[in-house]
Regions:
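N-terminal beta1-alpha1-beta2 submodule of the flavodoxin-like/Rossmannoid cofactor-binding fold
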Residues: 1-106, 152, 156-157, 161-209
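Short, glycine-/small-residue-rich phosphate/pyrophosphate-handling segment
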Residues: 108-152
Length: 209
């Protein structure tokens, strides 16, 4: 099972820290994980030129090419963003918009994957829920199944109060509780997904050699 995590922060700081923590936990539970950080990457905005509709690929040749490959390969996707202006980062927004080139190749290319959201705000109520909703909207548009940690603490995903420092986010016990609860549900859905997929293969006549 492959899990791909995207850190939408332009820095390798608090958002990167909690995403890496999440992926390390999954890795320890037997999942194959990979982290893509927007730090130092060149990913331009979607120009909506419709080149992808005709040529089945994006006209821009930048670091988004790596993201395209990993999005197709993963079973689970974690989107982690700092809260900026009450929403997601411009870096993550560009990645979302540029996914259009994948859909131009195959409308269902991301359908059935499992999605999870992480939002990190400088304030406790700094807009984390709005960031989650944007991530969840992206999941739903592309047929990705969004997973949260459930009611009472992690309704939409893992929410953190960073106070803009690594040392302070490490002290956010409530945030890490929301992360652990969301990861638990994320793992359950991933394992259920692979069970359903494997059962479908067997019914389709697939045989283990």
């Amino acid at each position: 099972m492959k899990v791909f995590g995207i850190c939408g922060s332009p820095r390798n700081d608090t958002t990167y820290h909690v995403l890496k923590e999440a992926l390390d936990k999954l890795n320890n539970h037997g999942f194959e994980t990979e982290l893509f950080s927007c730090f130092g990457k060149d990913i331009g905005p979607c120009m909506h030129c419709d080149y992808c509709l005709e040529h089945k690929k994006c006209i821009s040749h930048d670091d988004m090419l790596e993201v395209y490959e990993k999005l197709q390969q993963c079973d689970g996707l974690i989107l982690a963003t700092p809260v900026q202006s009450g929403g997601i980062s411009s870096n993550l927004s560009a990645i979302m918009d540029r996914t259009r080139a994948l859909e131009a190749v195959d409308y269902n290319i991301l359908r059935g994957k499992i999605g999870m959201s992480i939002a990190v705000g400088g304030d406790r109520t700094g807009g984390q829920d709005f960031a989650h909703l944007k991530n969840i909207t992206y999941f739903m548009i592309h047929g990705i199944i969004p997973v949260s940690g459930g009611p009472f603490g992690s309704n939409l995903g893992a929410s953190f109060w960073s106070r803009d420092s690594i040392e302070d986010i490490k002290k956010d016990d409530y945030g890490f509780e929301s992360l652990n609860r969301t990861l638990t549900e994320f793992e359950k859905f991933l394992k259920k997904f692979i069970h359903i997929h494997f059962t479908h293969l067997i019914k389709s006549g697939f045989q283990l050699v």
